[in-house]
């Protein structure tokens, strides 16, 4: 536990599951920043202490990897993957159980009784954020067993500031902006964020969701579709209400510095993995769109092109005891 709280990561395995390995390595990359913010870090799985020691030694992990061999802590937190146990019981061939297995346990092409037995005891993977008193203040879990939120993404969603990496900066007549990815390296199943920090100039405002009802162009962060990345709906902060006295309008705006978050998920399908094996990087393009006004003038809408290039890291399928 750090002086300002802790991040507790529950994962399936540092031995046989490549998506968890990638998540743990990315967490290590952010460890100095977390500790500098007074946040302690630990990761929990049903792996043996030997497996965790060897993985930490191999990948340079310095934070605590804790063994919950009998899944007691996992069960106490209420995140034991009960789908696995059900899939080993008398209803294992029930179509609904099989469908749940393919969403929360293993793809149909890999599914077997032996695999289910190996996975039994794992948690639904996710992250808990604790305050300084050890109370859970937020939690982040995935809907699909191959997807993993990065540490950087969790911190952005929790409102904990990051040092922007590979930022794109610009200034227009009405505002300043900085666009950056939460992570510059991604892999299959990575859930990350693209962010735009926006600071209107003095006496300027841009329009927030809700203002479209009055005919104004709302600020937007619009990424072009990609076959390898799924974009979630943009997260908008709460707006202010601006009173435009000449027309007696009350309209939703942003006048102070704010951040738009565009969460994105790298495709985790076998087909996408095959495509990405031939790639070294992902290029994602889109635009930051807005209309700005001051107390007297509404300026023409503007659209600023934005492109991010992210390094691709390939999944690690090698088990800990394999050399």
Residue locations for each model-derived region?
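Thiol/selenol-based redox catalytic cores and closely related redox-interacting motifs
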Residues: 68-146
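Structural microenvironment flanking redox-active thiols in thiol-disulfide oxidoreductases
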Residues: 21-76, 82-83
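Non-catalytic, surface beta->alpha helical segment in thiol-disulfide oxidoreductase systems
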Residues: 136-163
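Extracellular/lumen-exposed scaffold segments
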Residues: 156-323
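A short local loop/turn or secondary-structure capping micro-motif enriched for an aromatic residue
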Residues: 2-3, 16-17, 83, 145-148, ...
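Short active-site neighborhood of thiol/selenol oxidoreductases, capturing the structured segment around
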Residues: 1-27
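Short loop/turn microsegments at loop-to-beta-strand junctions
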Residues: 5-8, 124-126, 194-195, 288-289
């Amino acid at each position: 536990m750090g002086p300002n709280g802790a991040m507790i990561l529950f994962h399936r395995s540092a031995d046989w599951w490549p998506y968890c390995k990638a998540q743990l390595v990315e967490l290590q990359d952010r460890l100095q920043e977390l500790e500098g913010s007074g946040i302690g870090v630990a990761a929990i799985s049903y792996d043996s202490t030997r497996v965790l020691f060897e993985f930490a030694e191999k990948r340079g992990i310095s934070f605590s990897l804790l063994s919950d061999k009998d899944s007691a802590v996992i069960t106490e937190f209420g995140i034991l993957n009960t789908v696995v146990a059900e899939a080993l019981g008398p209803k294992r061939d029930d179509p609904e159980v099989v469908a749940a297995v393919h969403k929360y346990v293993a793809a149909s092409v890999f599914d077997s009784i032996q695999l289910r037995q190996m996975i039994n005891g794992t948690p639904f993977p996710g992250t808990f954020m604790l305050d300084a008193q050890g109370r859970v203040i937020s939690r982040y879990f995935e809907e699909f067993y191959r997807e993993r939120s990065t540490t950087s993404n969790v911190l952005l969603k929790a409102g904990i500031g990051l040092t922007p990496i590979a930022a794109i900066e610009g200034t227009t007549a009405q505002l300043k902006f900085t666009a950056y990815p939460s992570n510059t390296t991604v892999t299959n199943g990575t859930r990350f964020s693209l962010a735009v920090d926006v600071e209107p100039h003095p006496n300027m405002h841009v329009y927030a969701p809700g203002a479209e009802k009055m005919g104004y162009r709302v600020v937007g962060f619009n990424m072009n579709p990609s076959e390898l990345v799924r974009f979630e709906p943009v997260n908008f902060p709460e707006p202010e209400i601006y009173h435009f006295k000449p027309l007696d309008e009350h309209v939703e705006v942003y006048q102070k510095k704010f951040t738009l978050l565009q969460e994105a998920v790298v495709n985790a399908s076998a087909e996408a993995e095959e495509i990405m094996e031939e790639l070294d990087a992902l290029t994602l393009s889109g635009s930051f769109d807005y209309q700005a006004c001051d107390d007297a003038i509404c300026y023409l809408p503007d659209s600023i092109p934005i492109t991010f290039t992210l390094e691709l890291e390939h999944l690690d399928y090698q088990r800990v005891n394999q050399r």
